[in-house]
Swiss-Prot record:
Family that this chain belongs to: Belongs to the MIEAP family.
Subunit details: Interacts (via coiled-coil domains) with BNIP3L (via BH3 domain). Interacts (via coiled-coil domains) with BNIP3 (via BH3 domain).
Compartments where located: Cytoplasm, Cytosol; Mitochondrion outer membrane; Mitochondrion matrix
GO CC annotation: cytoplasm; cytosol; intracellular membrane-bounded organelle; intracellular membraneless organelle; mitochondrial matrix; mitochondrial outer membrane; mitochondrion; nucleoplasm
Compositional bias per record (Polar residues), positions renumbered to this chain: 123-137, 211-224
UniProt biased composition (Low complexity): 253-278
Induction of expression: By p53/TP53 and p63/TP63. Directly activated by p53/TP53.
Protein name listed in UniProt: Mitochondria-eating protein
Chain coiled-coil ranges: 118-187, 219-256
Basic and acidic residues bias spans: 105-122, 181-210
Key words, A-Z: Coiled coil, Cytoplasm, Lipid-binding, Membrane, Mitochondrion, Mitochondrion outer membrane, Phosphoprotein
Amino acid sequence: MAENLKRLVSNETLRTLQEKLDFWLKEYNTNTCDQNLNHCLELIEQVAKVQGQLFGILTAAAQEGGRNDGVETIKSRLLPWLEASFTAASLGKSVDSKVPSLQDTFDRERHKDPSPRDRDMQQLDSNLNSTRSQCNQVQDDLVETEKNLEESKNRSAISLLAAEEEINQLKKQLKSLQAQEDARHRNTDQRSSENRRSEPWSLEERKREQWNSLKQNADQQDTEAMSDYKKQLRNLKEEIAVLSAEKSALQGRSSRSRSPSPAPRSRSCSRSRSASPSTAVKVRRPSPNRSKLSNVARKAALLSRFSDSYSQARLDAQCLLRRCIDKAETVQRIIYIATVEAFHVAKMAFRHFKIHVRKSLTPSYVGSNDFENAVLDYVICHLDLYDSQSSVNDVIRAMNVNPKISFPPVVDFCLLSDFIQEICCIAFAMQALEPPLDIAYGADGEVFNDCKYRRSYDSDFTAPLVLYHVWPALMENDCVIMKGEAVTRRGAFWNSVRSVSRCRSRSLSPICPRSQIGLNTMSRSRSPSPIRCGLPRF
């Protein structure tokens, strides 16, 4: 801008303009009309050039001021002058310096109300101050929280050390008591053998009565001592179990404070079931590590197993079924129905198991307030008592009478025993969570829900209805924590209705000839009996 101003001053345009005005004034009366007009137009052109340069300088100066600076000056000086100039030019009057009505209007408005920019600046300042105060408060809270966390860590470490020391002392006491009991038994045996050798043969009958009385007294003393010893031993074991549980809880709390991600619990390999939970209550002691395992860790482990079942076990089951069934839709329907039935059977088994445990533990917890907690802890610690094979048989029985997949009988559902057993175990363990996990209800022909399911690769992505489901969605109360998979097609509702009607029409004859699969050409009756694994299928 300074260069343009220097250039304007160095041109001396205004000085030559004044000289031309003086010359025109002297020659005005002697000139003709055309000459006067030419002089006037020449002066107007020169003034326009100067005015253009001045407007360029004005533009550069306004740009240097930024986005907001200079706005008030342009409103108060330039706009009123332009208004007066255009008004005078349109009316044919001379420009009067007292005309600027817009300037007066802007001055009145400026004195009446503050500008929006000032109000915005004040609002921004107030917001900035409040934000700073909030930031300071958050920083103070963060410092205080760090102090509290450090104190809790120190207390947990001290409690852990004290618990370990007490456990070691109790173990030493238990060993000493066992050694004393063994020594007492050895002394008793030695005394009895010495008394037997010292008896004279002539007084055998008379001493026999005394020996019997002494033996009865010794047996009574031995039984009393054994009962006392068993009570002490039981108390010591209970104290060790409680302290071990506290130790594992403190270790879990310290590990969670160091790393928030829970470690998944290893899957129990034992699937055997004892005769009844009442005998298990008397014989087996619940493992403290498993009973105190956090709900979050068990939930994470079960979600991982459920995801592995979808990504690996489901595909393995599909490979087994594709050897017998060529249609992919039928294979996927069978696996989905097997999963749904497995969850249903596992939930029923969990209810019966919990009722049985509650009845077995009732005499031991008369008048206790933590009865439900004891029942839940026992169920969590003894999930391996679940009879998964019985549930597998129930699932296969339900699949045999399902009208969507049971006819025609082209495959034996016992092929899916391993898959069904894994799903039953996962569903049974999910019922022990707080809150329990369950699968979402799904029906063919329903409206596709993007929150619950994802479409399969061969779906019609513009279809609004579900043709059939591939995998169920996992729910926690009413919240979806793991999406399922569904196939969507146009006209899915009518296709599902026609398929159901065809299946029900075929269900009138449950015995139909078996298709040619491998070497077996036998016909099979579709009875509800779940024992079908003995028949060869390939």
